[in-house]
């Protein structure tokens, strides 16, 4: 019953291919064929690090997809934020529809870490809101990495934070085969060891029910399929996957593996062993505190830790159990925690997207976490072992990283140094588009000049991005443009990820024409409708006006045939000069290629879809943190029901009705009423 920890023995889903199959109507063009060949050759030659310098709109994601198909290795793609991760996830899913493309980001919609402020003697308890849909996708990602070779996981910096040890995760899994003799009580006990809960009334994710000799299990990593185990006289007679909502049989299986409900599941023996080592550490720490005459801290630590120990001994769990992860994983003091990188096979491929942002992020995570926890330990809120519940240090991440490709339009000094000159360029776009024309205009008349440019673009049906230096200036400019009849929105840091995506989508749909922001309009987001980027106060040297920032911001207009960037400045800074020189170099190469091959540039046409689809869940379905409304909606969806086919409408109606009844059952009547109104709109549209 207990499986060995050799991942090679894991069952594979025989209905799926084990090889990457790229599906795309396009063929590599422009600089792409040479870039793909070079990246693949370097990877197969064993080169540890290389860089792909790709301008905006050059098809970096498509190039990487071709590399993945040719090298045929499990792949981890890291992005700097959830928005870009969701966009990449959608793109890779469309490129590899027959393979296992997964999404691994933080499952917290809201997270307030445990903290202590000595100056005011204030202790802040941990509070969080967990997105169950993303939790399910994280579990699916680790299962895929352990069981399939055709796995591609898109992740954020969450990948360097602690997970349960893969050895425990593997040793606990339950492998079932038809004909196997198994005691029903033993089977139920094993499911509870995996932290599944028994629920005879409703089969929910991470639960099971028993009806005679039939057990139904809803795997924690699945959102659409549940497993039915039919026993006869102690033998497994049949294994069936079925729809947990309708009960419809999907397919019969010869073999199935049930994985733990959480990454932090561990054996009873390991938990009891951890309790003993925690007691030893507590004794040593109390002696230190008493010797320093810190009586209040000692009493506080003893009380909090004893309560946690009692909970762990009785139920195998306690709030904040992650602070004891070093004891639960059997690691030595100072050893790095297990992370997603421990689930990767040694021959995997790592792709760091927007590496000039992601690499510094990885380096910064450890220090911020350490500072907060040192205060908790010093004042007796946590044992010193809590310091080992942490993200990887940068050098630890480097040691665990497999062969890597850094992807960026503006690679940083680290990537260039690590690549040792192996930089592959993607400068020529398949569409023939050339980099935007860059103009410099005086600051004194920047607002009036900008308004006239905006009116010109609106006449053409295009969109405009404006980037300012301060929040106050962005607010004032938005108000001023609005007073002059321009449809404008302001994108600021208080807007959460999902609503940001909705705002950018509304810009592309033409619900407004101008988007004003500060530092939120740089990397990665595809907006082909944008033909003008205006950078105010471009001559104020600093982080927001560095060479890399300017190149990235100018690149937002690179997907449009009429693309233009205006830098408002009274003097030429070094950053401006470097950005303009690089832009001119790229334009020269692009124009030369187009003339040589007789290519006429054309704007990118990209369907306007919800890039968070599949990587989001209605806010009302999320677990709520203390004092946080469960039914808060971050952005209301406005689908075009008229464009839907009758079969799609029927499916949508069924889905909405299920959600409405669930909200009513949970006494969330406002959310239920909103969905009822959506159902009415959909029925009206279908009859029209």
From Swiss-Prot:
Origin species, per record, is Xanthomonas oryzae pv. oryzae (strain KACC10331 / KXO85)
Family matches, as Pfam families: Helicase_C, ResIII, UVR, UvrB, UvrB_inter
Looking at the record, the residues that make up the Helicase C-terminal domain are 446-612
One Gene Ontology term of the biological-process aspect is: SOS response
Q: Which keywords describe this protein according to UniProt?
A: ATP-binding, Cytoplasm, DNA damage, DNA excision, DNA repair, Excision nuclease, Nucleotide-binding, SOS response
Naming one, the record's GO cellular component terms include:
cytoplasm
Organism classification: Bacteria, Pseudomonadati, Pseudomonadota, Gammaproteobacteria, Lysobacterales
Q: What is this protein called?
A: UvrABC system protein B
Q: Where is this motif: Beta-hairpin?
A: 107-130
Report the family membership. Belongs to the UvrB family.
């Amino acid at each position: 019953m207990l499986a060995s920890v050799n991942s090679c023995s894991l069952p594979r889903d025989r209905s799926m291919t084990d090889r990457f199959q790229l599906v795309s109507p396009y063929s590599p063009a422009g600089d792409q064929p040479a870039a793909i060949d070079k990246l693949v050759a370097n990877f197969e030659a064993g080169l540890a690090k290389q860089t792909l310098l790709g301008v905006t709109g050059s098809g970096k994601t498509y190039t990487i997809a071709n590399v993945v198909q040719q090298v045929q290795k499990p792949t981890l793609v890291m992005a700097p934020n959830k928005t870009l991760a969701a966009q990449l996830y959608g793109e890779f899913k469309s490129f590899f529809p027959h393979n296992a493309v997964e999404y691994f980001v933080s499952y917290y919609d809201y997270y307030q870490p445990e903290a202590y402020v000595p100056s005011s003697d204030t202790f802040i308890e941990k509070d969080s809101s967990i997105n169950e849909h993303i939790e399910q996708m994280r579990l699916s990602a680790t299962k895929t990495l352990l069981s399939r070779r055709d796995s591609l996981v898109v992740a954020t910096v969450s990948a360097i934070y602690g997970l349960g040890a893969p050895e425990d995760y593997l040793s606990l899994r339950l492998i079932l085969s038809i004909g196997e003799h198994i005691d029903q009580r033993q089977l139920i006990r094993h499911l509870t060891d995996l932290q599944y809960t028994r629920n005879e009334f409703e089969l929910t994710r991470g639960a099971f029910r028993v009806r005679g000799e039939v057990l139904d299990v809803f795997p924690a990593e699945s959102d659409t399929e549940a497993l039915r185990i039919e026993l006869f006289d102690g033998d497994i007679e049949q294994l069936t996957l079925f729809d947990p909502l309708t009960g419809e049989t999907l397919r019969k299986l010869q073999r199935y593996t049930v994985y733990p409900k959480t990454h932090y599941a561990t054996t009873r023996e390991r938990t009891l062993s951890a309790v003993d080592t925690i007691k030893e550490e507590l004794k040593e720490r109390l002696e230190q505190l008493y010797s320093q005459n810190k009586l209040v801290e000692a009493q506080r630590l003893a009380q909090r830790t004893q309560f946690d120990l009692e909970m762990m001994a009785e139920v195998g769990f306690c709030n904040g159990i992650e602070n004891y992860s070093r004891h639960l994983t059997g690691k030595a003091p100072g050893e790095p925690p297990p992370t997603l990188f421990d689930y990767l096979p040694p021959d995997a491929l790592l792709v760091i997207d927007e590496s000039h942002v992601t690499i510094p992020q990885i380096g910064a995570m450890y220090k911020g976490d350490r500072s907060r926890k040192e205060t908790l330990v010093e004042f007796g809120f946590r044992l010193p072992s809590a310091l080992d519940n942490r993200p990887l240090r940068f050098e630890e991440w480097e040691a665990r990283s497999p062969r890597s490709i850094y992807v960026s339009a503006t690679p940083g000094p680290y990537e260039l140094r690590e690549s040792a000159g192996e930089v592959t360029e993607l400068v020529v776009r398949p569409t023939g588009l050339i980099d935007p024309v860059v103009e410099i205009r005086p600051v004194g008349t920047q607002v009036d000049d900008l308004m006239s440019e905006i009116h010109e673009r609106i006449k053409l049906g295009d969109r405009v991005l404006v980037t300012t230096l301060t929040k106050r200036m962005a607010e004032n400019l938005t108000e001023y443009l609005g007073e002059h009849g321009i449809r404008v929105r302001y994108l600021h840091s208080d807007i959460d990820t999902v609503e940001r995506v909705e705002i950018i989508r509304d810009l592309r749909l033409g619900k407004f024409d101008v988007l004003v922001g500060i530092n939120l309009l740089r990397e990665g987001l595809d907006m082909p409708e944008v033909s003008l980027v205006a950078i105010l106060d471009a001559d104020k040297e600093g982080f927001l006006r560095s060479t890399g920032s300017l190149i990235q911001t100018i690149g937002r207009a690179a997907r449009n045939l009429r693309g233009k960037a205006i830098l408002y400045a009274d003097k030429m800074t070094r950053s401006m000069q470097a950005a303009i020189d690089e832009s001119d170099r790229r334009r020269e190469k692009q124009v030369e290629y187009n003339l040589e091959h007789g290519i006429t540039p054309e704007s990118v046409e990209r369907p306007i879809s919800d890039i968070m689809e599949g990587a989001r869940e209605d806010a009302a379905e999320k677990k709520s943190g203390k004092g946080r409304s469960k039914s808060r909606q971050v952005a209301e969806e406005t689908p075009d029901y008229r464009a839907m086919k009758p079969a799609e409408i029927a499916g949508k109606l069924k889905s909405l009705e299920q959600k409405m009844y669930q909200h009513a059952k949970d006494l969330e009547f406002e959310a239920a009423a909103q969905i009822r109104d959506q159902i009415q709109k959909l029925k009206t549209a279908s009859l029209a």
